[in-house]
């Protein structure tokens, strides 16, 4: 079993919820990268984005370098972590990267945009991000899990992947 598991995917695909549940079931530590960044900087993700997306992405890259030091951990990354090639390389070289692929229609129906700075422009923005990032997520991962069933089904599938790798 890999001792570091990185969950990647669109905002609203279930990374944080699924990651926390899996970590409890497998007795692993759980880190939500956005919360890690907020605690480290004493600012919300929205506040950091107010200083520019590039500024935020630099902080996110630093967080990637820091979180790989943890062992026996499931990490829910930020949705845009894959935008920087160095982050993809860091994650892929240091653990198992799983892309949680949730159909964009389900993300739109489930998501609370108030906590997601890049999604405040609504449905069109989410669809645009999905199209922009889909291939990047596919290339950045070791495994893909489609999240269009029940949460229990997704958790079981991911647990099997983790245990068998």
Swiss-Prot record:
Cofactor: Mg(2+)
Residue sites binding substrate per the record: 34, 57, 79, 133
Gene Ontology cellular-component annotations: cytosol
Catalytic activity: shikimate + ATP = 3-phosphoshikimate + ADP + H(+)
Binding site for ATP: 12-17, 116
Database matches in CDD domains: SK (cd00464)
Binding, Mg(2+): 16
Cofactor info, note text: Binds 1 Mg(2+) ion per subunit.
Gene Ontology terms for molecular function: ATP binding; magnesium ion binding; shikimate kinase activity
Ranges annotated as spanning the membrane: none
Highest taxon listed in the record's lineage: Bacteria
GO biological process per UniProt: amino acid biosynthetic process; aromatic amino acid family biosynthetic process; chorismate biosynthetic process
Cross-referenced SUPFAM superfamilies: P-loop containing nucleoside triphosphate hydrolases (SSF52540)
Protein task: Catalyzes the specific phosphorylation of the 3-hydroxyl group of shikimic acid using ATP as a cosubstrate.
HAMAP family according to UniProt: Shikimate_kinase (MF_00109)
Family named by the database record: Belongs to the shikimate kinase family.
Name of the molecule in the record: Shikimate kinase
